[in-house]
Amino acid sequence: MAKKKSKKTPDNVLAQNRKARHDYTVLETVEAGIALTGTEIKSVRERRVNLQDGFAQIRNNEAWLMNVHISEYVQGNRFNHDPLRNRKLLLHKKEIRRLGQATMDKGVTLVPLRMYLKHGFAKVLIGVAQGKREFDKRETIKRREQDRQIARVMKHY
């Protein structure tokens, strides 16, 4: 009998934006391809990506990933890329329109949550996110602590 492939392996995730889940409430997620140059994809495969300050924008009916740092490829010499250049996101026209409508609301933005490889192609998980206020963050932390305590108590019984 053939071995079944796991749907999601942890080693295909190249970068994760943990700060985004803390600072934003993610309303919806969309998987997007990303247009990269040769030295960029080589750096991405070496996991030299920082999504921390990144965001996405819809401009001229195109989706762009901004402010994501992909380090220069070590063996890239003079053909290396600019680490902070804007990169085009590959989405269907309907998805771009839907994301554009979602970002019209006040306080809603597009943030990259995760970058991973899928069938050899780099993909970005984009989240439609709404900013949290300070008390929302504290409430989330408090709720998480309570859940941990309940789990600890239930473990003993």
Curated annotation (Swiss-Prot):
MF annotations from Gene Ontology: RNA binding
GO CC, any one term: cytosol
GO biological process: trans-translation
Gene3D superfamilies documented for this protein: 2.40.280.10
Cytoplasm found in the keyword field: yes
Record Pfam families: SmpB
Keywords: Cytoplasm, RNA-binding
Subcellular location: Cytoplasm
Similarity remark: Belongs to the SmpB family.
Physiological role: Required for rescue of stalled ribosomes mediated by trans-translation. Binds to transfer-messenger RNA (tmRNA), required for stable association of tmRNA with ribosomes. tmRNA and SmpB together mimic tRNA shape, replacing the anticodon stem-loop with SmpB. tmRNA is encoded by the ssrA gene; the 2 termini fold to resemble tRNA(Ala) and it encodes a 'tag peptide', a short internal open reading frame. During trans-translation Ala-aminoacylated tmRNA acts like a tRNA, entering the A-site of stalled ribosomes, displacing the stalled mRNA.
Protein name: SsrA-binding protein
Organism: Levilactobacillus brevis (strain ATCC 367 / BCRC 12310 / CIP 105137 / JCM 1170 / LMG 11437 / NCIMB 947 / NCTC 947) (Lactobacillus brevis)
Organism placement in taxonomy: Bacteria, Bacillati, Bacillota, Bacilli, Lactobacillales
